[in-house]
Amino acid sequence: MLQLNEIRKTFNAGTVNAKVALDGVSLTLNDGDFVTVIGGNGAGKSTMLNIVAGTYPVDSGTIRLDEEDITALPEYKRARLIGRVFQDPMTGTAADMWIEENLAIAARRGKRHGLGWAITQKERVAYREMLKSLDLGLEERLSTKGGLLSGGQRQALTLLMATMNHPKLLLLDEHTAALDPKTAANVLALSDKFIEEGKLTALMVTHNMKDAIAHGNRLIMMNAGRIILDVSGEEKKALTVDALLETFAKASGTEFANDRALLA
């Protein structure tokens, strides 16, 4: 369970460039929740994920994960508990390392290891089985460097690396935005698969309203650092893009000015 309580964050506070990114955000995710997050540019979506991951400190408020207060926990320690996939496919994998080496690093995350770092044959067998689930033929390319993979292949590999240790929370920060529509659909399908099979709790930020409606069991909309809509269950299933646009306009007094929100 993830609990955010009255989270506030202002960048450049006390200056003429002050920007309120999160304005008293409170949010609870129950175990197994897959929540999609929608909102215009500057709404606070990615800032919220960065706050949860520990990239940014909060100005005030608390963050709890499985009843543990992690508000002051450094980002590198939270990485043992939280899996994350970024927008840029180049971010999540090491370009100069083999596929099996990337997987080995992910598998050892949060574990103590000495000088004996060699990958065992047993591990290679396990990695091949994991890679088969991607259906990209990567199980036969363990010694291929990450930099030789396509953007979609690298993002799929990153997704596997982020979920292979069954994190308490998975953060997906516009992880298909840099991909072509077909590849994005494949990565989203893999996301659904890993979240469902691993019974993971997940937060997925997206600009694409159709994707926000189609995936997850719950949807929240943000504007000006606040949550202005929170729907789940049958209410979410009945949502349409037009209804979301209307809700945004009523709550914010502005049009949702982002063409990517309407992409198929």
Where are each of the predicted segments found?
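H-loop/switch region of ABC-family ATPase nucleotide-binding domains
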Residues: 206-207
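The feature captures the beta-strand-to-loop junction immediately N-terminal to the Walker
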Residues: 38-40
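ABC ATPase NBD coupling module
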Residues: 15, 69-83, 91, 113-116, ...
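Conserved ABC transporter NBD signature motif
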Residues: 61-69, 229-231
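A short, proline-enriched helix->beta-strand linker immediately N-terminal to the Walker B motif
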Residues: 164-168
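A short, flexible loop at the N-terminus of ABC-type nucleotide-binding domains that lies
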Residues: 1, 10-24, 74
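Helix-to-loop junction immediately C-terminal to a conserved catalytic motif
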Residues: 53
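Conserved beta-strand-loop-alpha-helix hinge in the C-terminal portion
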Residues: 226-250
